Amino acid sequence: MEKFRTVTYEVHNPKIKKGVRFAVLADLHGSIFGEENNTLLKKIQEYAPDAILLAGDMVVRMDPSTLETARKLLCTLAKNFPVFYAMGNHETKMKAKEHIYRNEYLEYQAELKQKGICFLANEKNKVVLAGNSFVVNGLELPLEYYHKPFSPKLTSEKMEELMGKPDPEAINILLAHNPKYGRTYFRWGADLILSGHYHGGVLRFSRHVGAISSQFIPFPKYCCGDFYKNGKCMIVSAGLGEHTVPLRIHNPRELIFIEMKP
């Protein structure tokens, strides 16, 4: 059976009136933990988050069986929790017009929407959780921003073109799958940024240091762990799964829990 660890971060923000809890899933890639993902479900249910945030890549673009794995898991979670789903590069590729499994992906997305899951593709959703006003923003980057090894710079202007501006009256969460552009995300002004994509850098040396990114950048700046700047926080998950080359060294799969407090 696949194994994972839980990592809990405590994030303080003066906009918070009352403590709120989040569970963050990134890079599931169709992984299964226990029968019907019961081990993963139990951990989340025991934590009892106020909402579940998906930072992309729940599926593998060339493996349609991962759609069913993710569908079962997310439909179960949606019965008890609000779920917000931002796109990773695998979702973006899978729903492209020319993709062989586009129809299967669109059916998957349609069913999850029917179950109440909020998909955010350069969209935002206002929600009140534990008496706090949040805006959950889901960034979907064009695929050229995932090119290996070179991808364009994400400017502040492009970021605003894709996402608009954050709401100054609310607590802004940004679900942004690719952590390469962490500097731009901080400048944009989200209170909490959640990313994945790098799978912890394959070989993880410490809380924040991994060997290589998914775009073959050695020792990427925002590889894994928590980062802070001007009162803002960015958390990069090492992910719950992997694809193509299932290699992890000193780098366990992880489920993220976040406690936001005043």
What do the PLM-derived regions correspond to, one by one?
Residues 191-199:
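Short hydrophobic/aromatic-enriched beta-strand-loop microsegments
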Residues 15, 28-30, 91-192, 223-262:
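Conserved catalytic scaffold of divalent metal-dependent phosphoesterases
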Residues 27, 56-57, 88, 177, ...:
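Active-site glycine-centered loops adjacent to acidic/histidine catalytic or metal-binding residues
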Residues 205-220:
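Short, surface-exposed loop/helix-turn segments at secondary-structure junctions
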Residues 16-41:
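Short extracytoplasmic
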Residues 21-24, 52-54, 85, 174, ...:
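Residue-level marker for buried hydrophobic side chains located in beta-strands
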Residues 1-16:
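N-terminal membrane-anchoring alpha-helices
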Residues 36-128:
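Core catalytic region of metal-dependent phosphoesterases/phosphodiesterases
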